[in-house]
Amino acid sequence: MKIGVYGASGRIGKLLLEELKGGYKGLALSSVFVRQKCETDFSHFSHSPLVTNDLKAFVRACECVIDFSLPKGLDHLLEALLECPKILVSGTTGLEKETLEKMQQLALRVPLLHAHNMSLGIMMFNQLAFLASLKLKDADIEIVETHHNLKKDAPSGTALSLYETCAKARGYDEKNALTTHREGLRSKESIGIAALRGGDVAGKHTIGFYLEGEYIELSHTATNRSIFAKGALEVALWLKDKAAKKYEINEMFG
């Protein structure tokens, strides 16, 4: 399957190019979208990709787009994909309602998956969080996430996704149960998220389930950002023969 990388100058984009250099389980890099000059030397790649700032040409040259960009960039990409539908794997966070609506329109025509975190470990972490939230009905739930000091969004998209998983398991009102700034007593049907920023931490997420006399903590730590690139490529392989739909990352585990 021919892969197009959108957001190639970003941290994950560069890792995607590195993973695709020799081909990844039959995936071939066919196009790279760049707004400015690309620093990557493509002479060592198994296939010479189209490197362009022409969004329509970029989309036409591939069968699946993997996107790790910015919200406005993804919005422009979706407009091009609605004209020329291709499979989409997106890890861009902080999206506006209008962008999500365009994504839903595209999902009527092709398979796509949008996730805040593409690591296989986080996929399993979500399932464990759901089970613990469901079974430990009396436990207070608190989430702590830690990232590098250059991360722009807080709480992280992954932390918000974990919150949604826990709230759904509990049957909480997802719009009102979230607490990111607490003063005074803790309300019973609430889930807190604390965001820490410092150094070069790739990503750490911990969920605490606090009971009387004991507590359980589930934790996931990313020690290398390559897990996000490899995870996205695995998602692309999984979507290849799927029907048109917006898939959830947990569906990969059946």
UniProtKB/Swiss-Prot annotation:
Residues binding NAD(+), per UniProt: G7, A8, S9, G10, R11, I12, G91, T92, T93, A115, H116, N117, M118
InterPro entries for the chain: DapB_C (IPR022663), DapB_N (IPR000846), DapB_N_CS (IPR022664), DHDPR_bac (IPR023940), NAD(P)-bd_dom_sf (IPR036291)
Subcellular location: Cytoplasm
One GO MF term: 4-hydroxy-tetrahydrodipicolinate reductase
Highest taxon, organism lineage: Bacteria
GO (cellular component) term, any one: cytosol
Enzyme superclass (EC): oxidoreductase
One Pfam assignment: DapB_N
Catalysed reaction, written as an equation: (S)-2,3,4,5-tetrahydrodipicolinate + NAD(+) + H2O = (2S,4S)-4-hydroxy-2,3,4,5-tetrahydrodipicolinate + NADH + H(+); (S)-2,3,4,5-tetrahydrodipicolinate + NADP(+) + H2O = (2S,4S)-4-hydroxy-2,3,4,5-tetrahydrodipicolinate + NADPH + H(+)
Residues noted as binding (S)-2,3,4,5-tetrahydrodipicolinate in the record, renumbered to the chain: H148, G157, T158
Keyword vocabulary terms for this entry: Amino-acid biosynthesis, Cytoplasm, Diaminopimelate biosynthesis, Lysine biosynthesis, NAD, NADP, Oxidoreductase
EC number(s) reported in the record: 1.17.1.8
Gene3D superfamilies named in the record: Dihydrodipicolinate Reductase, domain 2 (3.30.360.10), NAD(P)-binding Rossmann-like Domain (3.40.50.720)
Family recorded in the similarity comment: Belongs to the DapB family.
Protein name: 4-hydroxy-tetrahydrodipicolinate reductase
Biological source species: Helicobacter pylori (strain HPAG1)
